[in-house]
């Protein structure tokens, strides 16, 4: 029992495990495969890999699908035209394809979860000036706002825009966190009106909001 990362860790740490049946979406099964079959784990099993089975191959995550590796690689090349990409740390939310995690690894980046996003951003800024955060703009924005980074320092990169993700070069050069235009289709639905409605019905209620929700709902909660 746990979130997808915790479940993957539990399966990977089980030395007797031979198969993992992950009743979830693609990125969850990929994460389990990465953790269970990293080189040191395979060596401990004398070269045997753990097979990961996804019962429904059509099970996907709309947010993970909003950032394709080809789009991210193209964005990186475009960014290189206006800033030094050696000053950018790519960060991908764990809710993303394995190809994006590999991209981060190739470029000195990292994978984060919703619970450690603040620590990961802090780690990144201790090393480089900027961050490219994908695929969830809300998690990136809500986390960065707690670190005194303002919205005007967080340009949103639209992979379908014609040039620089819909930004001018000045916005990119002044940016600290470049946010990918992606979101969770479910968390996106929670709006300030829901918070107001609950507070009217239950004046003393404590409202917990996930950082994948829009900033406006997070701020009110």
Task: Outline where the language-model segments fall.
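The feature marks the mature, well-folded catalytic cores of soluble enzymes
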Residues: 1-221
């Amino acid at each position: 029992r746990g979130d997808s990362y915790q479940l993957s860790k539990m399966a990977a740490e089980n030395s007797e495990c031979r198969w993992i049946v992950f009743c979830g979406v693609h990125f969850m099964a990929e994460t389990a495969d990465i953790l269970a079959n990293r080189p040191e784990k395979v060596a401990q099993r004398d070269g045997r890999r753990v097979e990961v089975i996804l019962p429904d191959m059509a099970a996907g995550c709309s947010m993970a699908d909003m950032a394709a590796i080809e789009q991210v690689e193209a964005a990186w090349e475009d960014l290189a035209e206006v800033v030094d990409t050696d000053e950018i740390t790519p960060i991908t939310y764990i809710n993303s394809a394995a190809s994006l995690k590999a991209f981060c690894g190739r470029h000195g980046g990292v994978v984060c979860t919703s619970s450690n996003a603040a620590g990961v951003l802090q780690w990144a800024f201790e090393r480089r000036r900027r961050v490219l955060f994908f695929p969830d703009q809300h998690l990136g924005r809500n986390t960065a706002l707690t670190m005194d980074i303002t919205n005007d320092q967080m340009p949103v990169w639209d992979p379908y825009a014609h040039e620089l993700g819909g930004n001018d070069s000045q916005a990119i050069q002044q940016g600290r966190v470049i946010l990918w235009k992606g979101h969770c289709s479910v968390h996106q639905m929670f709006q300030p009106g829901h918070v107001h409605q609950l507070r009217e019905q239950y004046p003393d209620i404590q409202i917990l909001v996930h950082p994948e929700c829009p900033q406006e709902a997070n701020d009110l909660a």
